[in-house]
Swiss-Prot record:
Catalyzes the reversible phosphorylation of UMP to UDP. One of its GO terms (molecular function) is ATP binding. Homohexamer. Pathway: Pyrimidine metabolism; CTP biosynthesis via de novo pathway; UDP from UMP (UMPK route): step 1/1. Inhibited by UTP. Keywords: ATP-binding, Cytoplasm, Kinase, Nucleotide-binding, Pyrimidine biosynthesis, Transferase. GO terms for cellular component: cytoplasm. It comes from Methanoculleus marisnigri (strain ATCC 35101 / DSM 1498 / JR1). HAMAP family: PyrH_A. It is found in: Cytoplasm. This is Uridylate kinase. CDD domains: AAK_UMPK-PyrH-Pf (cd04253). ATP binds at residues 10-11, 45, 49, 140, 146, 149. It comes from the Archaea.
């Protein structure tokens, strides 16, 4: 059974504790788990940025802010595990070795952040390489990779397809401080390039987009892979 790693943005899973999409994602992930082995890396989203903002206002440095962000990603991961119930391994994986060990149970493996100064997108890329994943999916708050931030620039154009090299060129200037909200960090981009693992960037605000991409082979977003290949099922 092929392995798929999903980088699930905290802002799409848990926009706030009062308004979250956990139940919707639980339904879709359970359906998908019958077709492939799933690893989910959960981001911190707005909750992490709020904690980081308060920590900075209190004089905390970037290292402390990073640690706070990682804690929040793991709390979000714990919420997803609670929703998945028996479909998920009951513990949050805290490193790549644990993720591989937990996968032996045949259940969905969920983790959050691991390393300070790295986004959960970078964690998901390294995880995909570690487990030999066939596909990496970034479910985020926009429907693909754009020429500029579509939330700020009405003229931004979505890239339907990119090579790993082109992706790296786009993200070279991404911010790397704690809580940064960019399409991918440069670590993720470099791992994607060296591993050759294809990447889909899609709109995670609708969890069904995961099912459409993985099961039906339909991705309205950006496909990152070498020219002449396609990661989508036919």
């Amino acid at each position: 059974m092929k392995k798929i790693v999903i980088s699930l943005g905290g802002s799409v899973l848990v926009p706030s504790l009062e308004s979250n999409n956990i139940d919707r994602y639980v339904s879709v992930l359970k359906k998908i788990s019958g077709t492939c082995r799933i690893f989910v890396v959960v981001g911190g989203g707005g909750e992490a940025r709020r904690y980081i903002g308060v920590a900075r206002s209190l004089g905390a440095g970037e290292a402390a802010a990073d640690e706070l962000g990682i804690m929040v990603t793991r709390l979000n991961a714990r919420l997803l595990i609670a929703g998945l119930g028996d479909a998920a391994y009951p513990r949050v994986a805290e490193n790549y070795t644990e993720a591989q060990e937990f996968a032996q149970a045949g259940k969905i493996v969920v983790m959050g952040g691991i390393t300070p100064a790295q986004t959960t997108d970078a964690v998901s890329a390294v995880l995909a390489e570690s487990v030999g994943a066939a596909l990496l999916i970034n479910a985020t708050s926009v429907n693909g990779i754009y020429s500029a931030d579509p939330k700020k620039d009405a003229g931004a154009v979505r890239h339907e397809r990119l090579t790993p090299r082109e992706l790296l060129d786009i993200i070279t200037g991404s911010r790397m401080d704690a809580g940064a909200n960019t399409v991918l960090d440069i670590v993720a981009g470099k791992v994607i390039e060296r591993s050759g693992i294809p990447l889909l960037v899609l709109d995670g605000r609708d969890p069904e987009n995961l099912y459409r991409a993985i099961v039906e082979g339909v991705c309205v977003g950006t496909v990152v892979c070498e020219e002449g290949s396609t990661p989508l099922p036919s």
